Amino acid sequence: MIRFITIPDFADYQVTLKLMEDYVNKVISDHKPEIIYLVEHSEVYTAGTNYKQEELLNYGDIPVIYTGRGGKFTFHGPGQRVIYPILNLASPNRHKDLKLYIKMLEEWIINSLNYFGIKAYIIKDKVGIWVKVRKDEFAKIAAIGVRVRKWVTYHGVAINISTDLSKFSGIIPCGLENSLVTSLNQLGIHVEMSEFDKIIQTEFNKIFK
């Protein structure tokens, strides 16, 4: 069974990134076991490889970090559960298929949200996980941005639990103008991070066997 490691407090993004990269190298060179980091970051904007500088609107005193993950700009901060799976897609029980991996991530998060009574969706041509907030109007509740090195995955998923959503106004999230962002709290679901973590671990084992 894959070990989930919760990093305490509000983790610095760059420190966590180095932790991930070091462990990815160990999986590749030393065949270390797969693990999943659960993180709650201090406030930071991160940019993926497809970012456009004009999508960074007004970041104030929040640091901006340019990363090697896929995607565009997003925000990380307190109240957001960030999940970093370090999985070896080249292992016998996995598949060397990045699209399939992302699809499985989506299914994992959708099933976890469904446990709390939240009906979530994927939308064609829009990365991430979405919920309907009004008729024909959707808001993003989770962002996905991954990277793979020699078929070992890192970066991952960020789910808004009780995030300060006003911080997303400093960017165009994921490059989608006029898109809404939401959280479990905003949807009326108040859950402790530890309780949410139990569910994502249970649901992970159903999808990534």
From Swiss-Prot:
GO cellular component assignments: cytoplasm
Pfam families in UniProt: LplA-B_cat
Residues flagged as site, Lowers pKa of active site Cys: K140
All residue ranges annotated as the BPL/LPL catalytic domain in the record: 30-209
Catalytic reactions on record: octanoyl-[ACP] + L-lysyl-[protein] = N(6)-octanoyl-L-lysyl-[protein] + holo-[ACP] + H(+)
GO biological process, one term: protein modification process
Binding-site list for substrate: R69, G70, G71, K72, F73, T74, F75, H76, A143, I144, G145, G156, V157, A158
UniProt KW keywords: Acyltransferase, Cytoplasm, Transferase
Chief localisation class: cytoplasm
Regions annotated as coiled coil: none
Residues at the active site: C174
GO molecular function: lipoyl(octanoyl) transferase activity
EC number(s) reported in the record: 2.3.1.181
Annotated localization: Cytoplasm
PROSITE patterns named among the record's database cross-references: BPL_LPL_CATALYTIC (PS51733), LIPB (PS01313)
Enzyme class: transferase
Gene3D superfamilies noted in UniProt: Bira Bifunctional Protein, Domain 2 (3.30.930.10)
Stored NCBIfam families: lipB, PRK14341.1, PRK14345.1
Role, per record: Catalyzes the transfer of endogenously produced octanoic acid from octanoyl-acyl-carrier-protein onto the lipoyl domains of lipoate-dependent enzymes. Lipoyl-ACP can also act as a substrate although octanoyl-ACP is likely to be the physiological substrate.
Additional free-text comment from the UniProt record: In the reaction, the free carboxyl group of octanoic acid is attached via an amide linkage to the epsilon-amino group of a specific lysine residue of lipoyl domains of lipoate-dependent enzymes.
Record-stated family: Belongs to the LipB family.
Protein name (database record): Octanoyltransferase
Lineage: Bacteria, Pseudomonadati, Pseudomonadota, Alphaproteobacteria, Rickettsiales
